[in-house]
């Protein structure tokens, strides 16, 4: 299993958790972004810079994942494609997207997008990551990595 990170919008604190987990579990972790980024020196952590453009990083992740790989993303359409291709998707708040929940989450996202595009005022975006969110992310990441190690 590899970990692929949709790194353009991934919070720094989540990247730091991923860096520690990659080292601890010796799991290859690839950050995909359309800009240069700094990563710690590690044989388990690498970066892949793609050209700028709408969904270029997402498309590259979908093209490269293998069945069972984990993708870290808050992008619901990307998570849906990952699941359709046999991967796993975890968002930075620690919510695991699954075959059981991705369709309803995608439907809500599409509904909200339709509301915004029709001119309905929507209150701001999601709140900042809380300590609980960070803990949920770390716990679910550890659980997924342990399951992968167990086979």
Curated annotation (Swiss-Prot):
It holds the Pfam family DUF188. InterPro entries: UPF0178 (IPR003791). Coiled coil: none annotated. CDD domains: PIN_YqxD-like. Belongs to the UPF0178 family. PANTHER family: UPF0178 PROTEIN YAII. This is UPF0178 protein PSHAb0045.
């Amino acid at each position: 299993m590899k970990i692929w990170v949709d790194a353009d919008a991934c919070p720094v604190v989540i990247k730091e958790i991923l860096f520690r987990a990659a080292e601890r579990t010796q799991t290859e972790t690839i950050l995909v972004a359309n800009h240069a980024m700094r990563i710690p020196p590690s044989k388990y952590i690498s970066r892949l810079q793609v050209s700028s453009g709408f969904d270029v990083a997402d498309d590259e992740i979908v093209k490269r994942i293998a069945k069972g790989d984990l993708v870290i993303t808050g992008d619901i359409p990307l998570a849906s494609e990952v699941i359709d291709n046999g991967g796993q998707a975890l968002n930075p708040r620690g919510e695991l997207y699954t075959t059981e929940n991705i369709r309803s989450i995608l439907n809500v996202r599409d509904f909200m997008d339709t509301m915004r595009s029709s001119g309905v005022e929507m209150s701001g975006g999601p709140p900042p990551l809380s300590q609980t969110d960070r803990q949920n992310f770390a716990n679910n990441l550890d659980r997924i990595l342990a399951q992968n190690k167990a086979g």
